[in-house]
From Swiss-Prot:
Participates in the reverse transport of cholesterol from tissues to the liver for excretion by promoting cholesterol efflux from tissues and by acting as a cofactor for the lecithin cholesterol acyltransferase (LCAT). As part of the SPAP complex, activates spermatozoa motility. Residues 1-18 form the signal peptide. The keyword Transport applies. Keywords: Cholesterol metabolism, Glycoprotein, HDL, Lipid metabolism, Lipid transport, Lipoprotein, Oxidation, Palmitate, Phosphoprotein, Repeat, Secreted, Signal, Steroid metabolism, Sterol metabolism, Transport. The modification Methionine sulfoxide is found at M109. It comes from Odobenus rosmarus divergens (Pacific walrus). SUPFAM superfamilies: Apolipoprotein A-I. InterPro entries: ApoA_E, Apolipoprotein_A1/A4/E. Sequence repeats lie at residues 67-88, 89-110, 111-121, 122-143, 144-165, 166-187, 188-209, 210-231, 232-242, 243-266. This is Apolipoprotein A-I.
Length: 266
């Protein structure tokens, strides 16, 4: 389990740097990406849920039950917002420490990626150039057929389709040839990158697994610290939810009791 956690964390951290390397944009820390996604998701759920609650309370049934769900919803939203403020710095510290501990490994992997990219770029450029040439050649062959169709009538449509079919097959076959050639050219570099990654991992295992065990221990320690620091915030959340749940339960029981009395009186 510890190995899985460490592996996912390393891939997550290196993945963000690899994206920055290929796209050449400003790097975003793992915590910033997680925080942005979580914030957007929570805000959408919160706003959408509040709209549904408001619609229900405005309905005839909602007015009759008078559960005060909207007040409880606002209280719950406030409690969740407080939790996010409390746990944010703790999670930030966790990512900072984990990123620091895996800095050397990430630098080595990024170096390998950069080297492979430089080697395969000429093949990618060549493939793109050949593909553009094939498309242009196909367009030149098809253009006269389109003019011929515009000059003719409906009976020439079938003739045009018969003429286009071999041209389309020719383009497909030529494209397949270029793709196969590109795959053959890139295969050695893919194998090389895979071997280098295996070498990096093997280096961690050498010496009785001391280096790998150190990574595991550090990741486990950071997770333990995060868990301990988050406990007070989670307890505050639980305490904040108790009044909300109790208020909802009381309102619901009162509504059920009122409905029962009305049914018995009829």
């Amino acid at each position: 389990m510890k190995a899985v956690v460490l592996t996912l964390a390393v891939l997550f951290l290196t993945g963000s740097q690899a994206r920055h390397f290929w796209q050449q944009d400003e790097p975003q820390s793992p915590w910033d990406r997680v925080k942005d996604l979580a914030t957007v998701y929570v805000d959408v759920v919160k706003d959408g849920g509040r709209d549904y609650v408001a619609q229900f309370e405005a309905s005839a049934l909602g007015k009759q039950l008078n559960l005060k769900l909207l007040d409880n919803w606002d209280t719950l939203s406030s409690t969740v917002a407080k939790l996010r403020e409390q746990i944010g710095p703790v999670t930030q510290e966790f990512w900072d420490n984990l990123e620091k501990e895996t800095e050397v490994l990430r630098q080595e992997m990024n170096k390998d990626l950069e080297e492979v990219k430089k080697k395969v770029q000429p093949y990618l450029d060549e493939f793109q150039s050949k593909w553009h040439e094939e498309v242009e050649l196909y367009r030149q062959k098809v253009a006269p057929l389109g003019a011929e169709l515009s000059e003719g009538a409906r009976q020439k449509l079938q003739e045009l389709q018969e003429k286009l079919s071999p041209l389309g097959e020719e383009l497909r076959d030529r494209a397949r040839t270029h793709v196969d050639a590109l795959r053959a050219q890139l295969a050695p570099y893919s194998d090389q990158l895979r071997e280098r990654l295996a070498t990096r991992l093997q280096a961690l295992k050498e010496g009785g697994g001391a280096a790998l065990a150190e990574y595991h221990a550090k990741a486990s320690e950071q997770l333990s610290v995060l868990r301990e620091k988050a406990k007070p915030a989670l307890e505050d959340l639980r305490q904040g939810l108790l009044p909300v749940l109790e208020s909802f339960r009381t309102s619901l029981l009162a509504a059920v009791d009122e409905a029962t009395k009305k049914l018995n009186a009829q």
